[in-house]
């Protein structure tokens, strides 16, 4: 088995880590972490389904990726909507999410098409989540009261989001070119996915700390 194949399989398996953590710590999860846990379950099932479909059928699975991008946008809009305190930020999250969904649907229908890899939609998702995660860190670090950020479950999940999407943004943008010339570069995605899933797992094992509106 090649290193790329091993990392691919381990990357997929690592997707069950946050799911198991959520089941183990479910009674301690607040609304935000439950939404995040639901997304991780969907993400794991999609990755698992894509892997087996490629192994057994070897058919074009890009339509699934297009719809998964849309699902990801909706989940993360919900997560960050509840994570932010200020009404203006909540409204901004919703507006940007709707714009991202409309662009992704337009791309799916008129630009790249449903049978091509969603580079544009994935790039939009990456930019959106990098902005959301940086804004959340800004809110977290500018609270007026003292908090242990390492005990905040969403801190770890947000760190995983920023880590994964900030590193992979250029990989998703250039996926079509890299697919034919530098397939080994995609191992970056496998490694970052494993690390992100570990961060998500840590976050879901945290007991939510009380948060005060500022």
Feature roles, as predicted:
Residues 1-214:
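Terminal, non-globular segments
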